[in-house]
A protein has these predicted regions:
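Membrane-embedded beta-barrel scaffold of Gram-negative outer-membrane proteins
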Residues: 1-15, 19-25, 185-186, 211-268, ...
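Face-selective signature of the C-terminal outer-membrane beta-barrel domain
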Residues: 1-19, 41-154, 178
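Repeated loop/turn-to-beta-strand initiation elements of outer-membrane beta-barrel proteins
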Residues: 7-10, 65, 135-139, 181-185, ...
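Transmembrane beta-strands of outer-membrane beta-barrel pores
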Residues: 16-22, 59, 74-80, 143-149, ...
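Surface-exposed loop/turn segments flanking beta-strands in extracellular/periplasmic regions
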Residues: 31-37, 84-114, 160-163, 206-209, ...
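Structural signature of Gram-negative outer-membrane beta-barrels, strongest in the C-terminal barrel
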Residues: 48, 67-71, 75-77, 115-240, ...
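Gram-negative outer-membrane beta-barrel transporters
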Residues: 134, 237-239, 252-337, 374, ...
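C-terminal beta-signal and adjacent terminal beta-strands/loops
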Residues: 272, 317, 328-335, 355-404
């Protein structure tokens, strides 16, 4: 950042990275209610190269009784995805309740990583927050021009097989009313162009980038902030595409509408006792699908309720010692769009302590945490490709930090 004046600042950033992954893996598919699975082992080599940059200017000024905080920004993001994949020949059968130790299937290492897709995102945005009557009313208006260019490539010939070049101007507007210093009431609406999903490895079109889409979000809520304690409440609606596998081909031709309520607390509820967390109630409905068996169903991997609440206590018997506990709860989640299979709800408890002291004139903090104290066995979640992940077992974490 560079301050041109007291009220005008230039800013910019740049970043780049390359990720390479080589792995032998499989995706066991559950065949029936008894938990029987079937799988074919694959060997994959992935590579993702990416870079991003942005620059802009921020400024503050007044027009009459109206204060302005304006921003102009340009941005660019580019990535390239490459993957080599070879499948094994043997089918491995097992059971999630009684695992079978199958002999290792010999799978060759892919000789190359052909490029499968590349994406470029460019954007130009402008926004202004107008403040009136000692910040009693704040109105933010803005617009962003976005362009997404995506090409998919044939893994053998390198030829472009499909592509997208979409651009759109998306709006953003928000209003905040502050009757007093502790209470804020707000509402906002925004749209954004996003890149499409990448087809999963289990699909016949694995690695293919889906078309860009415009997501729309509307939200309204209330925030109470008394300095040492506060609470929030919000309701929201988000519409976006939803992907699905049809005849083993992945497409994002469905639409998902998320409606929800979020309640949160933060701060000191009594001397030396703090709370942080909240609860979310979610109705994630498939509003547009290509099948009557999925129309109106709940989206994959979208729990109707999730809770995360952490409490901390600064102990009176040991100066610098803080004890903490976290409760996590997630309700059942559907595994498929027909809503015939789900994973059950789960609850875990984490316990920890933090001890601050001075060692050799250096502030030092010791931390110890045990996650999933009761060692619950559970399915943690489901991704958009109907892949179920196993919850982490009881885990102990230790760390030491020093402020020099």
């Amino acid at each position: 950042e560079y301050d041109l004046t007291e009220k005008m600042t230039l800013f910019g950033s740049f970043g780049a990275g390359k990720t390479q992954v080589e792995r032998l893996f499989g995706y066991p598919e559950i065949q029936n209610s008894a938990g029987d699975t079937s799988d074919t082992v694959s060997y994959a080599k992935f590579q993702t190269k990416r870079w991003t940059a942005d620059a802009g200017v921020r400024g503050e000024f007044e027009t009459g009784f109206v204060g302005h905080k304006a921003t102009f920004q340009v941005s660019r993001y580019s990535d390239e995805f490459s993957r080599g994949l070879l499948n094994g020949g043997a089918t491995l059968n097992s059971n999630i309740y009684s695992p079978v130790a199958n002999p290792m299937d010999a799978v060759s290492v892919p000789a190359s990583r052909p490029k499968l897709s590349e994406t470029d995102l460019t954007g130009v945005a402008i926004a202004d927050t107008l403040s009136m009557w000692d910040d009693f009313l704040q109105v933010t208006v803005g617009a962003r021009h976005q362009r997404i260019e995506t090409d998919n490539f044939n893994a053998t010939t390198g030829a472009i097989t499909s592509g997208y070049d979409d651009s759109v101007v998306t709006p953003m507007v928000g209003v905040v009313v502050k009757p007093n210093n502790s209470l804020s009431v707000y509402a906002n609406y925004l749209e954004g162009l996003s890149r499409g999903s990448i087809a999963p490895d289990t699909a016949t079109n694995a690695g293919e980038a889906m078309a860009p889409y415009v997501a729309k979000q509307i939200e309204t809520g209330v925030k109470l902030d008394y300095g040492n304690f506060g609470a929030t409440a919000a309701i929201f609606q988000i519409t976006k595409p939803s992907g699905q596998l049809v005849n083993n081909v992945y497409n994002s031709d469905a639409e998902q509408r998320n409606r929800g309520i979020e309640l949160g607390v933060f701060g000191e509820v009594m001397p030396n006792v703090r709370l942080l967390g909240g609860v979310m109630f979610l109705d994630a409905e498939l509003t547009k699908t290509n099948s009557a068996t999925t129309q109106g169903n709940q989206a994959v991997g979208a729990p109707e309720m999730s809770i995360n609440l952490t409490a901390e206590w600064d102990t009176p018997f040991a100066q610098g010692l803080t004890l903490s506990g976290t409760v996590n709860h997630v309700s059942e989640q559907y595994v498929n769009t027909t809503n015939t299979v789900d994973i059950p709800d789960w609850t875990t408890l984490d316990l920890g302590l933090r001890y601050k002291t001075i060692f050799a004139e250096t502030p030092v903090t010791f931390r110890a945490t045990i996650q999933n104290v009761t060692d619950e066995d559970y399915w943690a979640g489901v991704n958009e490709f109907s892949m179920v992940s196993v919850g982490a077992p009881r885990t102990a974490l230790l760390s030491v930090t020093a402020d020099f």
